[in-house]
């Protein structure tokens, strides 16, 4: 059996690490990137011999270029890495609104560009947006950024064909990101989400990773967005 190589930005934690586990467990190799050297080394120790990693700043094109410089041929790319804040429109906070696009939209845009030399006809790219694209609850810059990523997936699918490009749009997910927040903040957010999602609970990182893996593996899907959100966008 021939095993493939995948690159994951944000592969040292959360959904990215969950996908890396799934790929290495079936014998594929992964190149993971993350901001924290400590988290990166912990992830590499867990993933074992099929994993390699580099620190990377996804908001810096030169850092992205260095990350992909010796990546070699890639069967797929997943780009969930982002760190950002959201804000209300009436606040008029340009720095927060623009930094959100820099961290989440442009980072994925340029990641695909810098990965191009390693992509081939049967490669797949999975971007990551968020369910607020289809059902905003305020924070319009955040909603617009997620919608822009879904549009980017469609545009890239056309321009980069036969490379497949799709987008994973998760809802609130029980992850390290949320578990590191104060318990009262986390529980309040989860309760609110539970009242909106049809399945009445946040998602799990393994569920999101399984969806990303499906998009990487299914050669008949391109230019699509899958909402792994427990039916949130239907309410």
Give residue spans per PLM region.
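Substrate-binding pocket helix/loop in short-chain dehydrogenase/reductase
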Residues: 88-89, 93-101, 189, 193
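Catalytic loop of short-chain dehydrogenase/reductase
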Residues: 97-105, 109-111, 122-161, 172
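N-terminal Rossmann NAD(P)H-binding glycine-rich loop of SDR-like oxidoreductase domains
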Residues: 12, 20
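Rossmann-fold cofactor-recognition segment
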Residues: 47-62
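C-terminal substrate-recognition "lid" of short-chain dehydrogenase/reductases
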Residues: 201-228, 233
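Conserved Rossmann-fold SDR core element
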Residues: 150, 159-175, 221-228
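Catalytic Tyr-x(3-8)-Lys segment
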Residues: 186-207
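Conserved NAD(P)H cofactor-binding loop of Rossmann-fold oxidoreductase domains
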Residues: 78-87, 230-231
């Amino acid at each position: 059996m021939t095993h493939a190589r995948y690159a994951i930005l944000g592969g040292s934690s959360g959904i990215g690490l969950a996908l890396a586990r799934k790929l290495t467990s079936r014998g594929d190799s992964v190149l993971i990137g993350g901001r924290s050297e400590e988290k990166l080394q912990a992830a590499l120790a867990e993933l074992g011999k099929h994993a390699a990693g580099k620190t990377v700043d996804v908001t810096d094109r030169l850092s992205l270029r260095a990350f992909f410089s010796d990546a070699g041929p890639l069967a797929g790319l997943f780009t969930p890495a982002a760190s950002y804040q959201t804000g209300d429109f009436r606040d008029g906070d340009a720095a927060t609104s623009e930094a959100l696009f820099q961290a989440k939209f442009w980072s994925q845009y340029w990641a695909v560009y810098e990965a191009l030399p390693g992509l081939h006809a049967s490669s797949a790219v999975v971007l990551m947006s968020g369910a607020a694209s289809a059902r905003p609850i305020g924070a319009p810059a955040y909603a617009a950024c997620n919608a822009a990523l879904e549009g980017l997936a469609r545009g890239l699918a056309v321009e980069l064909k036969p490379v497949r490009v799709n987008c994973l749009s998760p809802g609130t997910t029980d992850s390290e990101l949320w578990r590191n927040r104060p318990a009262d903040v986390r529980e309040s957010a989860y309760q609110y989400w539970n009242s909106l999602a049809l399945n009445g609970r946040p998602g799990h990182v393994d569920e999101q990773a399984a969806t990303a893996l499906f998009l990487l593996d299914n050669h008949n899907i391109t230019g699509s967005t899958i909402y792994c959100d427990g039916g949130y966008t239907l309410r």
